[in-house]
């Protein structure tokens, strides 16, 4: 007799899972951990319930369990993440192929230009750096742009890497993305008009790079190119970020962009 299975669709991707294979409790626990962020490093039971959509009673039980397991700490009113959660990120960074392969290339770019470079991926409405240039002799003297430490999350619509990664999506998906996440104004230079933003994505897709000036934070400028795999699919973005009082846009286009493109081409044969 043929079995008919019910499936649950992922809210942010095309993934599906059979309902009998889905563990709702695990999903809620992970959602609770994700509720903590830069904007809200300490949360109480009510705030967690509001952020995750679960009841206060359930939120309290999840918080207590995660505290017992060592992932959270508390002062009996607010909860916050502990260093134990870094086990997940360290495991990813030590096992993921792209960050390991890209590291030496990023360091070389940094040595050539004394600027900061990173590999960034798209995660829903945010971009996440998974590899970053590092040269001890220069990092001691150089001020790193805000948000470029590994694992930090930045709004995709206001970053060069985000627009590169969004530009390769189908128009229907781009519109759905905008409708779902919006185009929040972060600085006077953030693009918040949907039509203008879509036109910008078209221009990025055609030119195969994106230059972004002070859209996420005043005083910062960045340029990014897509990183493709051997099958021609965009899997990440490679960018260079600096202060506006240190480099001019034309310098990034004339001098840094060719370096980014050459590096992206070399990575394509390795990922």
Swiss-Prot record:
Gene3D superfamilies per UniProt: 3.30.450.40, Winged helix-like DNA-binding domain superfamily/Winged helix DNA-binding domain (1.10.10.10)
Recorded name of the encoding gene: pobR
Organism: Acinetobacter baylyi (strain ATCC 33305 / BD413 / ADP1)
Descriptive protein name: p-hydroxybenzoate hydroxylase transcriptional activator
Domain HTH iclR-type: start-end pairs: 23-83
Cystine pairs: none
Induction entry: By p-hydroxybenzoate.
Gene Ontology molecular function terms on file: DNA binding; DNA-binding transcription factor activity
Known DNA-binding region: 45-64
């Amino acid at each position: 007799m043929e079995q008919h299975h019910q499936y649950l669709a992922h809210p942010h991707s095309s993934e599906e899972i059979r309902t009998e294979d889905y563990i709702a409790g695990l999903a809620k626990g992970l959602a609770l951990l994700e509720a903590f962020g830069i904007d809200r490093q300490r949360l109480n039971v009510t705030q967690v319930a509001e952020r995750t959509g679960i009841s206060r009673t359930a939120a309290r039980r999840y918080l207590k369990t995660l505290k017992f397991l060592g992932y959270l700490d508390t002062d009996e009113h607010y909860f916050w993440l502990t260093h134990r959660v870094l086990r997940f990120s360290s495991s990813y960074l030590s096992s993921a192929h792209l960050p390991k392969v890209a590291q030496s290339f990023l360091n070389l770019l940094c040595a050539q230009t004394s600027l900061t470079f990173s590999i960034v991926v798209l995660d829903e409405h945010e971009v996440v750096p998974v590899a970053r240039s590092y040269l001890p002799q220069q990092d001691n003297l150089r001020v790193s742009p805000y948000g470029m430490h590994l694992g930090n999350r930045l709004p995709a619509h206001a970053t060069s890497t985000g627009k590169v990664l969004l530009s390769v999506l189908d128009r229907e998906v781009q519109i759905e993305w905008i409708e779902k996440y919006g185009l929040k104004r972060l600085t006077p230079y953030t693009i918040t008009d949907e039509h203008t933003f879509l036109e910008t994505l078209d221009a990025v897709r055609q030119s195969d790079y994106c230059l972004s000036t002070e859209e996420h934070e005043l005083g910062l400028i960045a340029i990014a190119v897509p990183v493709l795999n051997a099958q021609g699919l965009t899997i990440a973005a490679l960018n260079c970020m600096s202060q506006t009082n240190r480099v001019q846009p034309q310098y990034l286009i004339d001098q840094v962009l060719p370096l980014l493109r050459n590096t992206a081409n070399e990575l394509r044969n390795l990922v």
